[in-house]
Amino acid sequence: MLNKNDIVEVEIVDLTHEGSGVAKVDGFVFFVDNALPGEVIRMRVLKLKKNIGFGKVDEYVTLSPSRNQDINATYLRSGIADFGHMTYTEQLKFKRKQVVDNLYKTAGISDVEVAETLGMKTPYAYRNKAQVPVRRVKGQLETGFYRKNSHDLIPIEDFLIQDKEIDKLIVFVRDLLRRYDLKPYDEKEQTGLIRHLVVRRGHYSGQMMLVFVTTKPKVFRIDQVIAKITEAFPSIVSIIQNINDKNTNAIFGKEFRTLYGQDTITDSMLGNDYEISAQSFYQVNTEMAEKLYQIAIDFSDLNSDSIVIDAYSGIGTIGLSFAKQVREVYGVEVIETAVEDAKKNAERNGITNAHYVADSAENAMAKWSQDGIKPDVIIVDPPRKGLTESFIKASVAMQPEKITYVSCNPATMARDIKRYQELGYELKKVQPVDLFPQTHHIECVGLLTRVER
């Protein structure tokens, strides 16, 4: 009979989709962080439930050849890089396996080509955005990342997967906050001033934005702080204050104030320029997002007569990237500010054949159908929860030749593809793309074509 704090020798037989090792002992399935298949470990029992348990590695008996032994354990503890203990080659294989397994288990698909995961040459320092909590640790203001499954801050200076200029700026600002005695937020007591630092940097432009998230509007000696920052970092074109006085896990409150420079930064993707605000959705890995979108374009096999619906269009990054190659693009997005941004981005890039509406995709498609619009391709890029049944039915009712599915969750993609197959579409091919190296997240593009009946 197992008890808490027992130490048992186990072999890791599998990995969960989030990268925890799986071991089986005495009728329990145990989940163990930082353990890989094939490894034998001495495991300390942390928690027991009815037939599952949680353990931690007390000692490694046998190491996997797939282990990256150079990773700093801080990155694993914080969740910054929950796959960092795997070699990058192994990460790419595992991510492809996730896609293959989900398609088979959920949709019964085993005969469709799933390509090798497209990875990065240098799978570090890729994030163009950082959201960093500011807290007091051991009596001192610190910036860092939360310990996994907690709100305990681990102080970190090198975030491994963030742009190095962003890391430098965060450390510089942290030191200024200490010097000017600006108080960090205390979540339990609901006191303090500085909650988060949010930084964005244009991959191509190099322009930087810094956002101070504060509990109150007034920040003592903020002008002096800004002068020091802009002197040290000439690439900063925007400093914003966001006021969040609520007891919430949400980073931003409703009010934004521009303290210095512009409201936005500018960057480019696939040849188009985009204005990016503090709250804009913009892919955090520009290099791999360009590859992801190019694959979606290639799968869609577009030409100058193509009419394309861009569902979940955001600020227009997918639709505008191919708008000049096709006849018309119709984009729909539920967030009104994103739609306004998409319209501005179309105008900025001299694109006149892209039309954006703020609505649910189902409603927009029903209206477009009534107006006689017949798309050749519908490109979908839904959130992690995937597509709704009403969306799937509305998209099928428009009878496009192709549906190109850009997914950030292989489980919901497989579920949705199963439904599309029941409604007369067939999955032709899938390309996984690694937008988030060192983490468990995986994106992929799937091509569905209409079956002639």
Where would I find each of the regions flagged by the language model?
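Short, solvent-exposed loop/turn elements at beta->coil junctions and helix N-caps
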Residues: 115-122, 187, 196, 200, ...
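Short, conserved phosphate/pyrophosphate- and ester-handling motifs at nucleotide-, phospho-/glycolipid
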Residues: 38, 162, 285
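Extended interfacial segments that mediate partner engagement and assembly in macromolecular machines
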Residues: 61-71, 75-184, 204
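Short, acidic/hydrophobic/Gly-rich beta-strand patch recurrent on exposed beta strands
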Residues: 21-26, 144-147, 211-213, 342
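Terminal RNA-binding accessory module
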Residues: 1-74, 107, 355
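Internal alpha/beta scaffold segment
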Residues: 153-195, 216-240
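Carbohydrate-binding surface patches
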Residues: 198-202, 208-218
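Rossmann-like S-adenosyl-L-methionine
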Residues: 2-5, 9, 17, 217, ...
